[in-house]
Amino acid sequence: MGNENSSLVKIRRGSKEPNVIIECVDSKKDHLSTPVYRKKSRRSVSQSRPTSIIEPPKRSIVPPIPALIKGQLSGDDSISIGSRKSSVSNFRLSSDGSGDSLLSPLTASSNDRRRSRSLCSAQMKDDAQAVAAQQNKDDKTGGSGGRKASSGLVPSLNRLRIQQCFKAAKPSIGDAIMKRAAASRAEMRTMLSKMNEKQIECLGKQMFELITDAVENADKSEKVLTHARQLGGTYASLCPLGFRPDLFAPLADAAIAECVKLDGVHKRCETLSAWSQLFSALFTGVRDGYYQRVRHQRRTSLPQNTITKQLSVDFSKTSDTSFVR
């Protein structure tokens, strides 16, 4: 094959299959077609096992050009494809998929779109701003009083949540608290059954006034706790009807449940935490006032003459025994 003077000049190839036989014949003995030798061709690279997958080059897709732009570009044949891409990129697509906004230029408002926010997040932002304004107001009025001068029953953020919730409250919430407490404890039902409607209404009104005072003066803890102690002292007079100090717990739970129902803006867990902190402080004062009144009643239950007589008798006994010795 490498010799040019060789007589094997005619090569016949049948196909490109790997098993095809290449026949070389003599040119002088073409009519006999006797093959001198046969040789199998090598496998092509494409038919061997692929070692790696060669991906075709990616073509960049050019976006369609509006008819108006095509008419403008057809007059100038020297414009390149890159300039067409830049001209197309200067137009924006509308969000609804219509083609009318392709011809409208870009504006600052299109890039400055605000995402829709939930009512809860917007309310939290308003609460944070209100807290900042309240803190600035406290700093101006309180001066250098420190943290204790501006401290209240609950933190500032919870105080604002409570005040916003209680705007929807009605005076009938006191009666609802009493009914809920009676439904949860049999002892409470027994005590209320021994009272007339006017007395029960008076208890509900006192509870509503206490909550209203606590909400309005949440930053004045001493004033609110004084009111709570006075209310707790009135419950000491209900002991003959079967009232016990452990019934303050169902009263507090009923008050929290009724006040949480008033809110529909904040998260339920946040509202529950805020009201729980407030009523925990309130009923601490109510319980303290109850025990103060009970102790006072026990001290004053015996007549003064009986107390002095007992003291004199005890003193005489001790003096006689000491004299005998």
From Swiss-Prot:
Residues 32-65, 99-152 are annotated as: Disordered. InterPro entries: Globin (IPR000971), Globin-like_sf (IPR009050), Globin/Proto (IPR012292), Mb-like_M (IPR044399). Residues 153-291 form the Globin domain. One of its GO terms (molecular function) is heme binding. It comes from Caenorhabditis elegans. This is Uncharacterized protein B0361.4.
